[in-house]
A protein has these predicted regions:
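Non-catalytic carbohydrate-binding regions of carbohydrate-active enzymes
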Residues: 1-99, 107-128
Length: 128
């Protein structure tokens, strides 16, 4: 069974950046004012959540234990499982670490930097 994947919080954060940017444009087009600073708060919540799952060495695990604590009968090969901590899976997981950096960079830029303009134009703007 799979457990909580931290990197998916980062991917959700990127989705929310894209959604927020389109929502702001629509609100402004409809004549409403939108406070982008308020909308920034939840973007940082995703980044903070990812950081809280990091271990003592600030490495983000592949999966996090999401059940009550479970003591291991064989500590040599299987770690104790503690709620909110890594499951003993890959740590650091390069994908999780990269997603954290991508989300932080995209938050700072205010947009998803890895979305090619041609893709944005076709699927968001409707320009072909």
């Amino acid at each position: 069974k799979g457990r909580l994947w931290v990197l998916l919080s980062g991917e959700r954060g990127q989705y929310e950046i894209a959604l927020c940017n389109e929502t702001i444009k629509k609100i402004q087009l409809d004549g409403f004012n939108c406070n982008e600073k308020e909308m920034d708060g939840w973007r940082y919540n995703r980044l903070d959540a990812m950081a809280k799952f990091a271990n003592e060495g600030l490495m983000i695990p592949e999966q996090v234990w999401d059940k009550p604590d479970l003591r291991s009968p064989d500590k040599q090969f299987v770690p104790d499982l503690k709620f909110g901590e890594g499951t003993g899976s890959a740590t650091p997981l390069a994908w999780s670490m990269a997603q954290f950096i991508r989300l932080a960079t995209n938050i700072k830029a205010g947009k998803n930097l890895d979305t090619p303009q041609v893709v944005y134009d076709r699927y968001v703007s409707g320009n072909r």
